[in-house]
Amino acid sequence: MNPIISAASVIAAGLAVGLASIGPGIGQGTAAGQAVEGIARQPEAEDKIRGTLLLSLAFMEALTIYGLVVALALLFANPFV
């Protein structure tokens, strides 16, 4: 295997995981903060807010998992070789 392609694949895998986790991390923090604020304002709506929060957190976490899948594909099933 060409060492330049191997090095570029490792760097790309690291960037894929790193960049794929920045957006969802910020989004999850914002969503959790807004959920806590909403529950503090309307405690009677806690169940509905918590359910919506957990569903949206799962969708945001899926984006990070996609980045991990791309990184694993670059590391173990390198299409550039």
Swiss-Prot record:
The chain crosses the membrane at residues 3-23, 57-77. SUPFAM superfamilies: F1F0 ATP synthase subunit C. It is a multi-pass membrane protein. The record marks E61 as: Reversibly protonated during proton transport. It comes from the Eukaryota. GO terms for molecular function: lipid binding; proton-transporting ATP synthase activity, rotational mechanism. Keywords: ATP synthesis, CF(0), Chloroplast, Hydrogen ion transport, Ion transport, Lipid-binding, Membrane, Plastid, Thylakoid, Transmembrane, Transmembrane helix, Transport. Disulfide bonds: none annotated. InterPro entries: ATP_synth_csu_bac/chlpt (IPR005953), ATP_synth_F0_csu (IPR000454), ATP_synth_F0_csu_DDCD_BS (IPR020537), ATP_synth_F0_csu_sf (IPR038662), ATPase_proteolipid_c-like_dom (IPR002379), F/V-ATP_Csub_sf (IPR035921). Its main location: plastid. It holds the Pfam family ATP-synt_C. It is found in: Plastid, Chloroplast thylakoid membrane. In plastids the F-type ATPase is also known as CF(1)CF(0). Belongs to the ATPase C chain family. HAMAP family: ATP_synth_c_bact. F-type ATPases have 2 components, F(1) - the catalytic core - and F(0) - the membrane proton channel. F(1) has five subunits: alpha(3), beta(3), gamma(1), delta(1), epsilon(1). F(0) has four main subunits: a(1), b(1), b'(1) and c(10-14). The alpha and beta chains form an alternating ring which encloses part of the gamma chain. F(1) is attached to F(0) by a central stalk formed by the gamma and epsilon chains, while a peripheral stalk is formed by the delta, b and b' chains. This is ATP synthase subunit c, chloroplastic. It comes from Cicer arietinum.
